[in-house]
Curated annotation (Swiss-Prot):
Group of enzyme by EC: ligase
Keywords, sorted A to Z: DNA damage, DNA repair, DNA replication, Ligase, Magnesium, Manganese, Metal-binding, NAD, Zinc
One GO term describing the cellular component: cytosol
Gene3D superfamilies in alphabetical order: 5' to 3' exonuclease, C-terminal subdomain (1.10.150.20), 6.20.10.30, BRCT domain (3.40.50.10190), DNA ligase/mRNA capping enzyme (3.30.470.30), Helix hairpin bin (1.10.287.610), Nucleic acid-binding proteins (2.40.50.140)
GO molecular function list: DNA ligase (NAD+) activity; metal ion binding
Protein's name according to its UniProt entry: DNA ligase 2
Active-site residues from the entry: K155
UniProt-listed CDD domains: BRCT_DNA_ligase_like, LIGANc
Binding positions for Zn(2+) per the UniProt entry: C448, C451, C466, C471
Length: 708
């Protein structure tokens, strides 16, 4: 095995242990195996594992925005697959999808829209020789090659987006998807603070598709995480993941809470206007149209100057206000771009240079074990403090027991740390050459660190698990999840307060929250009387949370946000949901068979039934009564802009408590558009469709409610 690939190999082995990369026969691969020697059988198996693992990581990165490995490790997977496919030649059918440089970010729950012009990705390289090879190939395509100038731009680390403006008005916002069609996220345009609903001036095309990237600045990312830390909530892993999650959330978001940005640097279809003569002119036009453009672009006259610009930008990236993961080199001249043409997935006149992730070495002081709400035990390396990309790193995840065993990580080892996505610190390699003469493999304890119960681990499981449902550590995590924004959203009840309430045994399970008094909260936590009163008020309001949010907060097996939404739409209230059988769950659109089985098993458990019954008795999840009797029963409301006194979440709660529903898009079915400061394109859509527009005060009157 290649030494440089050891960390990737461990992850592949981990995937196999999880059952994710079980040996699934690729069409004709078993036949091909008959024509190879016994010595090549293992290589064939590895080739198959690589294809499955790459597909899994594509899904995690492009669709779920939850990458598990660094870009460098991902690129290494693809490189080894290329080498194996090359070695076997025609004896093994190739899998073009596994090696495509363009993923597919389309997910369920969004309408699809076709791009007027195909939206491409970029070829990538990580070496200077790759950059120079690109230059040589381009010179063979562009005649004459003497006048070749380049534009070097930052490679923003966000979500690729295409905005269509017709007659100067924003009419469509679409993700790249598979290049031909993407997810229509026009309804979320208001979440991007720098995206104008209208172009500036008048010298714009009749129709134009502008391409760019939606991202989150480091300052905004840190502001969001700082607030979550102060409230005891889990922090987000990276700006890119949060940007993708915010734009593609099916829940209405408060723009004051998560403020996205966008930058444009490319062009799709253009009608009623001459095409730009160069990339430089395009960037100038984008700025003249009032759109955010690339400010750090640099025009250079040679590949030598381009390489110097790439290196200089790399040296400044830790000081930039936004995340980048590379630099893009583009041929400036539009005529030359046309001559160079495009491949299946990328233009031949541009290339992205990916920067190596920041890496530092340090020693492992110890290994801490964290207990999750499902009982999974996660090992975390406690490190000698080290600076990495401007941050002080003291801890890094070790993923699970299987990964630790395969890496043979030991206390005292010298390890290499990288920041995945420039944010998440991860142990990527163990330097055994620096290991002391006296060391011992880490042995997982057999007792739960949270309750002392015996830990168990199935043969095919990568994790040790605590099976004690009454484990205080598990209960803390369960309650934390329930009160979080992913659940019913009880503001002011942070991790420290939840832990104090559970440790004091005043809160043993989630339903105990609904019997808390302000005096008890004050007695068992560090909250003041005023803070405790607000917490109890928030708890009482959460009784009216929609069923979908209650289900999401319970964290039932196999059910994520999308599944909770589907279940909330299917069942009238919590008792009806509790009574659901497997045959009922099979009728819920969007639930996978394995999720149905896991949920049916959970609902059949006496403990689950008791918990749901207690919640129902507390008046939780009784959405049908509210929906039938509310002043907004059956009415659809859409929000745009920032409201004067209500957060977007609270405004949504008011509508739902009054029996209405909140949508992200203005359609003919919209009852009212509630407009605040800085409204987005929804205001124009409402005017065009004849939808009445009201302000917050009118909403409060109609909902017969008052602001917080």
């Amino acid at each position: 095995m290649r030494p440089w690939f050891s960390s990737v190999a461990r992850r592949l082995a981990l995937g196999a242990s999880l059952g994710v990369v079980a040996l699934t026969v690729i069409p004709n691969l078993s036949c091909a195996a008959r024509s190879v020697s016994v010595a090549e059988t293992e290589s064939l198996r590895r080739l198959e594992l690589l294809r499955v693992e790459i597909a899994r990581h594509d899904d995690l990165y492009f669709r779920k925005a939850q990458p598990e490995i660094s870009d460098a490790d991902y690129d290494a997977l693809k490189q080894e697959l290329r080498e194996l496919e090359s070695r076997f030649g025609r004896r093994v059918p190739r899998d073009p999808a596994a090696l495509r440089d363009m993923g597919d970010d389309r997910v369920s729950g969004f309408p699809k829209a076709r791009h007027r012009m195909r939206m491409l990705s970029l070829e990538k390289t990580t070496t200077e020789s790759g950059v120079r090879a690109f230059d040589q190939a381009l010179r063979r395509l562009v005649k004459p090659p003497a006048e070749i100038a380049y534009v070097v731009e930052p490679k923003f680390d966000g979500l690729a987006i295409s905005a269509t403006y017709e007659e100067g008005r924003l009419v469509r916002l679409v993700t790249r998807g598979n290049g031909e069609e993407g997810d229509d996220v026009t309804a979320a345009a208001g979440r991007i603070r720098t995206l104008p609903p209208r172009l500036a001036g008048a010298a714009w095309p009749r129709v134009v598709e502008v391409r760019g990237e939606v991202f989150l600045t480091f300052a905004e990312f840190e502001r969001i995480n700082r607030g979550r830390r102060e409230n005891g909530r889990p922090t987000f892993s990276s700006p890119r993941n949060l940007a993708v999650g915010t734009l593609k959330s099916l829940e209405p978001e408060d723009r004051e809470v998560r403020q996205l940005d966008v930058v444009f640097f490319g062009l799709g279809a253009i009608d009623g206007h001459a095409a730009p003569a160069s990339q430089t002119q395009l960037l100038e036009w984008i700025a003249q149209w009032g759109l955010p453009s690339v400010e750090d672009a640099r025009r250079v006259d040679s590949i030598d100057d381009a390489w110097r610009a790439v290196q200089e930008l790399g040296g400044r990236r830790s000081h930039l206000a936004f995340p980048i993961d590379g630099a893009v080199i583009k041929l400036d001249d539009a005529v030359g771009q046309t001559a160079a043409g495009v491949s299946e997935v990328a233009p031949r006149w541009a290339i992205a240079f990916k920067y190596a992730p920041a890496r530092v070495g340090t020693r492992v002081r110890g290994v801490a074990l964290q207990v999750g709400r499902t009982g999974v035990i996660t090992p975390v390396a406690e490190l000698e403090p080290v600076a990495l990309a401007g941050a002080r790193i003291t801890r890094a995840t070790l993923h699970n027991a299987s990964e630790m065993e395969r890496s043979d990580l030991r206390v005292g080892d010298f390890v290499w740390i990288e920041r995945m996505g420039e944010i998440i610190p991860a142990v990527v390699a163990v330097d055994t050459a620096q290991r002391g003469t006296v060391s011992a493999p880490f042995v997982f304890p057999r007792d739960c660190p949270g309750c002392g119960a015996l830990l168990v681990r199935a043969l095919d499981d990568a994790n040790w698990r605590c099976t004690n449902d009454d484990c205080p550590a598990r209960q803390v995590r369960k309650v934390e999840h329930y009160v979080s924004d992913e659940g019913v959203g009880i503001r002011g009840l942070g991790a420290a307060s939840v832990e104090a309430l559970v440790r004091s045994q005043r809160v043993r399970e989630i339903p105990d929250l609904y019997t808390l008094t302000a005096a008890e909260v004050t007695a068992h936590t560090r909250l003041s009387a005023a803070q405790a009163a607000r917490v109890v008020d928030a708890i009482q309001r959460s009784r009216k949370a929609p069923l979908r949010r209650v289900i999401a907060g319970l964290g039932l097996p196999g059910i994520g946000p999308a599944g909770a939404n589907a279940l909330g739409a299917r069942f009238a209230d919590l008792p009806q949901f509790a009574a659901a059988r497997e045959s009922d769950l099979q009728q819920v659109e969007g639930l996978r068979p394995e999720s149905v089985r896991a949920l049916a098993t959970a609902l059949s458990a006496e403990r689950t039934q008791q918990l749901l019954a207690r919640l129902a008795a507390a008046g939780v999840g009784a959405q049908s009564a509210t929906a039938d009797a509310g002043t907004l029963a059956g009415k659809e409301v859409v929000f745009t802009g920032t409201l004067p006194t209500l957060s977007r979440r609270r405004a949504t709660e008011l509508v739902e408590e009054a029996g209405g529903r909140v949508a992200d898009r203005v359609t003919a079915a919209t009852w009212r558009l509630v407009a605040g400061r800085n409204p987005a394109s929804k205001l124009h859509q409402a005017t065009a469709l004849g939808v009445p527009v009201i302000e917050e005060a009118e909403l409060l009157r109609l909902a017969e409610a008052a602001p917080e």
